[in-house]
């Protein structure tokens, strides 16, 4: 499970050092893809395979389904961390997420997310305000 917030930097070659807590689960390989809110989703290969199977079950007669699958999968990149735990983020994904040098890598349960640090701080400041009322809006979460 991916938890916490980490603050790595993007190096000049477009690489990020994965948080130590995430490396074991991602050591054999991972998939980077576009996420909502202009972040990058990071899935273990196993979790991405599970998600892909769910997508295969979705009705392709739905235009919305086809559009989502195209955008989600066309931006995906499978990567293997090097011995130092570094992963290269493809230029197209860096541009999509507007990544600068300072990053925020957050745990989101079954996935991690890579954000530009400023974008994450702005998002968090906006969402924390309503966080205390969220349990009323999402019954059964606790």
Curated annotation (Swiss-Prot):
Keywords: Cytoplasm, DNA-binding, Repeat, Transcription, Transcription regulation. It is found in: Cytoplasm, Nucleoid. Residues 5-47, 76-119 form the SpoVT-AbrB domain. CDD domains: MraZ_C, MraZ_N. SUPFAM superfamilies: AbrB/MazE/MraZ-like. GO terms for cellular component: cytoplasm; nucleoid. Pfam families: MraZ. One of its GO terms (biological process) is negative regulation of DNA-templated transcription initiation. It comes from the Bacteria. Gene3D superfamilies: Transcriptional regulator MraZ domain. Its main location: cytoplasm. PROSITE patterns: SPOVT_ABRB. One of its GO terms (molecular function) is transcription cis-regulatory region binding. Belongs to the MraZ family. HAMAP family: MraZ (MF_01008). Forms oligomers. This is Transcriptional regulator MraZ. It comes from Arthrobacter sp. (strain FB24).
């Amino acid at each position: 499970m991916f938890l916490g917030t980490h603050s790595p930097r993007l190096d000049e070659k477009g690489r990020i050092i994965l948080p130590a807590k995430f490396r074991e689960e991602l050591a054999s390989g991972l998939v980077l893809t576009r996420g909502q809110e202009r972040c990058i989703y990071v899935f273990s290969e196993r979790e991405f395979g599970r998600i892909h199977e769910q997508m295969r079950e979705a009705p392709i007669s739905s235009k919305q389904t086809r559009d989502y699958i195209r955008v989600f999968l066309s931006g995906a990149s499978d990567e293997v961390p090097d011995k130092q735990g570094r992963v290269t983020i493809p230029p197209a994904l860096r541009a999509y997420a507007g990544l600068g040098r300072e990053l925020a890598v957050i745990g989101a349960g079954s996935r991690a997310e890579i954000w530009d640090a400023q974008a994450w701080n702005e998002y968090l400041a906006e969402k924390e305000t309503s966080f205390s009322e969220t349990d009323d809006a999402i019954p059964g979460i606790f």
